Amino acid sequence: MTTDPAVDGGSFIEAAAVGALGAMFASAVGAPLGFAVPFGVVGAANGAITGWRQVYDWSCTNGFVAFALDSTWSIPMTAAGVVSQALGIVRGRPDYDATLSRRANRQVFRRGFVPRPGFVITVGNVVSGAGDTSVPRRRRLITDHEDVHVWQARWFGPLYPLLYGSWMVGGGAAGMVLWATRRRSEPFAKVVESCAYYLNPFEWWAYSRHGHWPP
């Protein structure tokens, strides 16, 4: 079945098949933890949505790996991604970009859930706040920077927000000390943000892949 890549839509068959597989994988992972039903619901929801949109690239290994991780080890991050999509819908006009999502193993929204205006945010396999993706610079931000965060969430799974958040807290504290002892001539917020955010290893990884380090 062929579809216009600019349209948010695709295959009922793929939605049903991927939804069923996602539910099966996720519930199997959740069963030993007593979370078979909630994990299964998340796996089914992610599978149905991504299947309909034809997100996973089944023509190469990456697509199978992405689906497997999203439906098992990284299911908490996948759940967060489903929630972020729902919040984007509540906000209104999430503006899904199929050209950056179809067979790209990620879901991209020009608007969507954006807690910090002007910043792109990636939650699980969902990228929101992409902006005007007709501009090459914005497209490269998604393909080279945010895509790294999508895969970080997959590989590190439930550890990802813990590791990222721990650095933010520790880096922020270090930034305060640095400002107080050596860099009082600079804006306090800038020093703290540099240590907490820009020096975060996960951000260094993404900015380096994007070719924008130092940012």
Regions found by a protein language model. Name each.
Residues 147-165:
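Catalytic Zn2+-binding segment of zinc metalloproteases
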Residues 10-23, 48, 61, 65-89, ...:
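Metalloprotease/metallohydrolase-associated module, dominated by Zn2+-dependent proteases
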Residues 118-120, 127-144, 197:
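Short pre-active-site segment immediately N-terminal to the catalytic Zn-binding motif
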Residues 58, 113, 133-137:
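Generic hydrophobic alpha-helical membrane-segment signal
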